[in-house]
Structure formats: C-alpha cells, structure tokens
Amino acid sequence: MKVVFTFFNLFFLAGTVLLLIFTVLSGSSKHFPLNKFYWLEADTSGIKNAPANRSAWTFWGVCDKADYSNCLLGPAYPISPEDNFGTTADIPKDFVDNENTYYYLSRFAFAFCLIALAFSGLAFIIDILGFCFEIIDKVVIFLITIGLLFLAGFASLQTAVVVLAKNAFKNDGRYAHIGAKSMGIMWAAFACLLICWLLIFAGTISNSYKKHIARVKAEQGQYSQPTHGPAGDESSFTRAAPPTKDEENTGGIRFFKIKRNQKVSDDESV
C-alpha cells in the first residue's frame, strides 16, 4: 500500500512541477507552443510605447501578440500599463487610479509562483526516497504544505489581477481577452498539488492509525496471558483436602463383599 501511495504522490507532484514550468516559460519564446501561453490579450492601440496595437501580457512581460517579436521583458513584470509604458496618456482610468493594486498583485504573484515551484520540485526529488525510508513522508508533507500555500496564493493573486485588468480595458471600450490556456494550467497545477497533499496526508494518518491499533493489541495481549498458578478446583485449599467417600451409603456394598470373601474361604477349606 505504501508503494501505491508513493507512486501516486510522485505522479501528481511531477504534474505540478511540469505545469508550473510551463507557466514560468510562457512568453519566453516566440515559437510554438510557448507563444500560446499568455495571461491577458488587450487592445493597446494609441498608447505610447506599447509594443503593438494588440499586446499580450505573459509571465515575463508584454509582447506584440502577432509574433512576439517586440517585447518589453523583466522579472516580476506587472500587468500595469502605466508602469509598463511609462505614461498615463490613453491608459484606461482604472489602471491610473489603482496603480498600486495592479503593481503589487502582479509582483507578489510572480514571487509566489517561483517559491511554489521550488518547494514542489524539492518535494518531488525527496519523495523518490519514500520507497526506502518511511520518515521521508513527514518531510514531504511539510514541503508540499508550504508549496500548496504559496501556489494557492499565486493562483488567487494572478487570477484577481488578470480579471481586474480585463475589466479595466473593457470599461474603457477596448478589446480584452483572458488567456484560457495559462489560467487553466495554473489552476491545474494547484489541483494536482492539492490532490497530492490529500493523498499523502491520508496515507500518513492511515499508517499512524494502524500502528496505534497494533500497539493496543500488543498491550492487551500481555494483560490477557494466563497465569501459572492454580485455577478453579486445583487451588491449594482443594488439594489439601482429598475427596472422601460417603461411608453412610456403602454398608450394603461392603456386606456383599464380605459375604463373597467368606464363601471363597469356605470353598478352599473344603
């Protein structure tokens, strides 16, 4: 059973790590399939310093949606046109009024994603040793729990900022479209890690319960072992007084025994 649990843990951990790697690599190349992953596509025509009339925000920056040839890239690149393009002219009003909201949501989401990937990858490597060492499960539970918390934070923050940005462009009369592939991969990674956490947590509880039951049965077996002393009618009191025959009701039997013996003696004398 432990081998089965470990196999499924590795399967879902590998899925989480792979999906997060796809998320991190989104927008890093103009070639298929990485050019299909983006958070938001929006109409940026007329905005100064925008890479194109139709721009796409990826994990690393904002690019020309047509061919990803013209990009503005950087670590923790926010979905905030005012910070991206260095101007407020023709920028949707909500981006200007709530600049800090878009800026910090995006940057914290970036950091949370990398932390979640690090903990998930480390848990995957260590969990391979779970086939040999039982104590590994406790270490893996800790790593997966931390990774799950940061991945939940990343998915929540990124979803929030993407939806807010889409609504901001829509309210300004501009086209905006959420990248379903990137969003789906992000939430699929969270689902895989959550399933992995539930499996390993359930397996640990099951093993602990089995050990507890075995320990209780062992203790009960020690207390229920029979003693070597006298039991029942074999006590010292019973053995001290050997059973006696009832002398009152054996007179007739003794009479016939005596008469029989006398008859045998008379025959011998004759």
UniProtKB/Swiss-Prot annotation:
Example GO CC term: the record gives: membrane
- Keyword Ribonucleoprotein among UniProt keywords: no
The annotated region (Disordered) lies at 220-253
**What topology in the membrane does the UniProt record assign?**
Multi-pass membrane protein
- InterPro entries for this protein: SUR7/Rim9-like_fungi (IPR009571)
Keyword Ribonucleoprotein assigned to the entry: answer is no
Bilayer-crossing residues are: 108-128, 135-155, 185-205
Phenotype when the gene is knocked out: Leads to defective tolerance to cell wall stress and antifungal agents targeting cell wall components, defective plasma membrane structure, defective endocytosis, impaired lipase secretion, SAP2 over-production, increased adherence, aberrant biofilm formation, defective macrophage killing, and decreased virulence in a mouse infection model.
Key words of the record:
Cell membrane, Cell wall biogenesis/degradation, Endocytosis, Glycoprotein, Membrane, Phosphoprotein, Signal, Stress response, Transmembrane, Transmembrane helix, Virulence
Q: Spell out the protein name for this chain.
A: Protein SUR7
Report the source organism: Candida albicans (strain SC5314 / ATCC MYA-2876)
